[in-house]
Structure formats: C-alpha cells, structure tokens
C-alpha cells in the first residue's frame, strides 16, 4: 500500500507522500505575449467539449472574434489555455496550435521544461478542482447541469488568485505515466463515442 498524507485541502484530501503540494504559480508560468505586431491571424477558440481548436471549427454559438487581432494574445502548442471567465465550467485545454486568443484567456506552461504539461492540464480538468474555485471569482450565475458539470456565466478568476492555489505535483516520471494513461483512456473513449 502506498503511503499517503493529508493535504489539508478539501477538494484533494490525501495524496501520495512522495508528491509535493505546490502553489500553481511555482509550477506554471503565464505566457503574456501580445499579437502586436500581428504574428498570426489564426484565431483559436476554447470550449469545454472540443478543447483548443481553430475558431472556424467551433461548434455552436459564442462570441464573434474581433477583426483587429492585434490586442489578442498568442498561444503556442503545449500551452494550457484557460478562459478566465469560464474555468469553472471546464474551459481548459491543451493547445496543439499556434494562434491568437482573446485577452481574457490565460496561457500557462511549466517553469521546468522536463515537467509534463499534460499532467497539469488533466489536473485542471477535474471536476473536483474546478469546484474548488468557487469564491475566487466575480460572477453572475452558476448552475449545475444534469450530468453534474458546473456551468457559469462570466465567473472571472484573476491570475493572482489562481496562482495562489495549491495542487498536487507528482515526480516527473509519474506525471508522464499518469498523462500517458489518461491520454490512452481518453482516446479509447473518443473512439467509442465516434462509432
């Protein structure tokens, strides 16, 4: 049996004793790179269902992009992209694209290049983590859907508050094993859904 210890964090509970608890700001750095001068006109979108995609592949409605993309921020492949106003509803994804996004989006990447960004992305996508964010933002409406997902409308969480949160940090080799396992499981589920 693996030794665990109490995190003192209600959403997390116990975690493996050889892991660390760290503030997000010490694990991930925010990329704040403006698209000015314009380096790309490829606008990316982020949805809870589809993740980070080119805007023209987006299903359903949503905000229309601005024609002037010089105020947008740049996102790179390997960046965790999150909508600061919809984190609670699962608007978090790992970008496979270089493009520009609305300035309300955060782009995060590990401080250490050896760490597995997928591990952090999966952590942020857990319902338990997303529910722990209540009270951090300023919002208008919060609803729970029939499948247990939380839906919010404009619940903005400032990066300075987000960065102060503690998350469990596995050793690097274990981060990779966890992310590989979840990638394989998600691919299997996606294949079953597509059939």
Mark where each language-model region is.
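Non-catalytic DNA-recognition/assembly elements of restriction-modification systems
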Residues: 2-36, 164, 168, 172-177, ...
């Amino acid at each position: 049996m693996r030794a665990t210890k109490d995190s003192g964090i209600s959403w997390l509970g116990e975690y493996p004793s050889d892991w660390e608890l760290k503030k997000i700001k010490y694990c991930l750095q925010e990329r704040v790179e403006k698209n000015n001068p314009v380096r790309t006109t490829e606008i990316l979108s982020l949805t809870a269902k589809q993740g980070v995609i080119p805007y023209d592949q987006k299903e359903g409605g949503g905000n229309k992009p601005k024609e002037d993309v010089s105020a947008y921020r740049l996102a790179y492949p390997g960046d965790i992209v999150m909508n600061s106003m919809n984190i609670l509803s699962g608007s978090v994804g790992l970008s496979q694209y270089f493009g520009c996004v609305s300035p309300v989006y955060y782009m995060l990447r590990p401080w250490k290049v050896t760490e597995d960004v997928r591990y952090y992305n999966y952590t942020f996508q857990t319902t338990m983590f997303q529910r722990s964010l209540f009270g951090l933002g300023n919002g208008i409406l919060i609803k729970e859907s029939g499948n247990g997902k939380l839906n919010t409308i404009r619940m903005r969480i400032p990066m300075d508050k987000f960065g102060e949160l503690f998350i469990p940090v596995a050793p690097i080799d274990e981060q990779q094993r966890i992310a590989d396992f979840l990638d394989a499981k998600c691919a299997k589920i996606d294949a079953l859904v597509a059939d």
